[in-house]
Amino acid sequence: MRILLPLLILISISSRAQTLRAGEAISLIQHRYAGTPPLNTVDTIKAGDPNTLVTGITTTFLDTMEVLRAAVRRGDNLIITHEPTFYNHLDNTKFFTDDPVYKEKLAFIEQHHLVVFRLHDEIHADTTDHILKGIYEELGWDKYPHPPGPRGQYFVTVPQVTLAELARSLQSKLHVQTLRVEGDPNLSISHVAFLPGSSGLEKQVLALRQPGIEVLIAGEASEWETVEYVRDAVAQGKNKALILLGHQVSEEPGMERCAKDLRELFPGIRVDHIVAGQPLWNPEHGPVANSPQ
């Protein structure tokens, strides 16, 4: 019976694909990523009516205006975003009540009857951090060994390489427009801590403190916190380095992986992944066109 249950669920979902409501779909997605979110989880509906019939699903790192427009063009009305819709972690809109940018974005969502759900805490908190796994797969690092234990997945042993070589490889494979590096370019690297997104000073420093770790790869970090910690560590002769990919670069592959999961979960419903793109550009090369189609 335990083997048949997932199959029966899939058959049920497929048979009622035309009558699946957003709230029901969201509940199934949360069940798929069975992580335990914090009590004050941000994994909630940010806009829209949960009773809306689902016509298609879009996953994305962040539901920018361009992502929302692309979703509408594709006929998708359930948006699964990893990061906030309204510019702050809790999506608190009190400050933006009379803001023209906020008002236009909200009006667009309402006009097109979109439902926006944030999938952040649960997709990270599952036994496997699916956002981390996504970028490991993108880099081909899923084959490399990790230490045992629940936090072991955030540490990986890679073939020996210099810091400069590692940075160039990451920039090339991930098409990073504004990659930043701190540390000795010739530092030998084989033990890596990888914290996608913006995990904050304490988690980043704790990762750097782990025995043998030479470099932390992160999405972003406060320049006056982790960045200065690494600067002092290097000045003290410690073999430490920092690579900042950019928040979107570090987490978009995980949400693309999410889209693959949802295609299996909802076999009768269109599921797209729409890349949010990198918001910042390097004046040496100019902005790269990465707007969603």
Residue ranges and their predicted role:
Residues 18-293:
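Active-site catalytic microenvironments in core metabolic enzymes, especially phosphate/sugar-handling
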Residues 13-17:
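Sec/Tat signal peptide C-region and signal peptidase I cleavage site
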Residues 3-12:
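Sec-dependent N-terminal signal peptides
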